[in-house]
């Protein structure tokens, strides 16, 4: 992810500042936004019980924003509130019915006893006393901020009397922070996909409720349910609309006009995990691409440009082996050769090819060396660095395995999802290559196997660095690709002591993980790969 920050002031010339990441733009204040009392303009309402709050053409702090120009607009249904002489929070009697650059609000109440008054913008869903940054936000078109009012945007100001005029002026200051997501990709597979939502999780609350204190006028904060996560939906639910499927991902570089998505969050220092939900409408596969951002101070009245390269992790097709074979399962018939018909390596679940090793004259055939009751470890280079059976048991039984049903990845030219998070060996207490968790060396005295359940809760943001991810890469049986996206089997370097047909392997699915040798036929085309390739380092 590109990590630069630019700060723009809309009341001054462009300034830039290189810092950690993102782009920050400060919302300009409404320095020329006036409150006019008892207007004498014959075209205006002269009702003595109403005060006119004028939002003029020159103002730049309205409630929606044009990213490129910095212009702001009042939106349909935007009301303001003003605390009057009696200390009552008064709601304007009118609001725009469309997107406008200027609007004249009418507010009931008394505004004669003071030279200043407190002004509030509390969003569109307010009860008149509070506003909440929503945990579910929705944007129906790219580069559009009309949803700010329902997402929890709010602002405050002090209106002060203009000397020599029967008017009040105020500067509206927006209080939340704003994230502007701009995903892009050079992956041609993803170019045919759509962004359907952006899910942001934090190590602390990023959604909150703010209530106007009737005594002090301050906005008192209180927590909301599930305030550590906000989900922004990025599609138009109207059937047949241009954004019905979501926002396009056709851009090779950041483009706010192509898929810019805006989220309102509570200001503060947050460590964020951003999950971009991407859908291939042709195959109906929908999943996530995850980015984790370091702790950063997100300031109020500021927006941050969150550019993200969505180049998903790609896994090769070259690490499937029969147990301890000299060459990989499809050596000479690799999918990259694009052989005709079913000659070469199958790349889709359920497809088969007859060109797999079928006897020990083939270098792709398994090692069939065996002596009853004697430990036998793999001897070929491709198996030298993979975990032995003891280590596999530590991962399965003590690695706190957690299934991730949504993280996207590619292999052999196709998009898949599904995999498991396991603790890195550094964070597994007692981890040993010489003994399993039960204290026994399974290389010399092993049994059939052991299983463990799998959690469906992802590692927390604070702990995610302690885990690595194994994709559900499936396996090959008799030349056919099985269960890719649903399960995976990884060979250990240890053979079964009691049956010449078997070797130990780790296997997992969405509900279970286990290590065993029963049904671990050496002729299976399981994955043989060191776990450091997947981030266990």
At which residue positions do the language-model features occur?
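C-terminal, surface-exposed recognition/capping segments
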Residues: 406-537
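Sec-type signal peptide cleavage vicinity
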Residues: 2-397, 402-405, 409-411, 417, ...
